[in-house]
Amino acid sequence: MLSRIVTCFLFLLSSLPLFAEEEAAQSKNTFVQPAVMLAIAILFFYFILWRPEQKRRKAMEKRKNDLAKGDKVTAMGIIGTVDDIREHTVILNIASGKVEVLKGAISEILKPNDNKS
């Protein structure tokens, strides 16, 4: 069984140069097709992945900068009301206590008409 596997493997290895020579003879424009595929991939990543994420990030950053006392926010799954805003942190009222949270940890700013319980 092992000898059959080794024989098949050696046969495939010995025939690889034949496939390579045949491919080189068939295609003369080897630069155009990969360049087009690369351009399509770059456009896909830009318009489908990177650009929408950049827009969401800018919108959330603007909302974080516009935070005001009394806004309801979620930070790491905790829902609280903004009590005080500092340079890099926010003080949240949660139940009967206060918690200091980094502005970057705020994941969502709830609108007054949101009913999330």
From Swiss-Prot:
Transmembrane regions listed in the UniProt entry: 30-50
Membrane topology (UniProt): Single-pass membrane protein
Subunit structure of this chain's protein: Part of the SecDF-YidC-YajC translocase complex. The SecDF-YidC-YajC translocase forms a supercomplex with SecYEG, called the holo-translocon (HTL).
Compartment(s) of residence: Cell inner membrane
Originating species: Chlamydia pneumoniae (Chlamydophila pneumoniae)
Described purpose of this protein according to its UniProt entry: The SecYEG-SecDF-YajC-YidC holo-translocon (HTL) protein secretase/insertase is a supercomplex required for protein secretion, insertion of proteins into membranes, and assembly of membrane protein complexes. While the SecYEG complex is essential for assembly of a number of proteins and complexes, the SecDF-YajC-YidC subcomplex facilitates these functions.
Keyword annotations from UniProtKB, A to Z: Cell inner membrane, Cell membrane, Membrane, Protein transport, Translocation, Transmembrane, Transmembrane helix, Transport
Gene Ontology terms describing biological process: protein transport
SMART domains: YajC (SM01323)
Statement: the UniProt record of this protein carries the keyword GTP-binding: no
Predominant location category: membrane
Name used for this protein in its record: Sec translocon accessory complex subunit YajC
Similarity comment: family membership: Belongs to the YajC family.
Pfam families: YajC
Highest taxon in the source lineage: Bacteria
GO cellular component, one term: plasma membrane
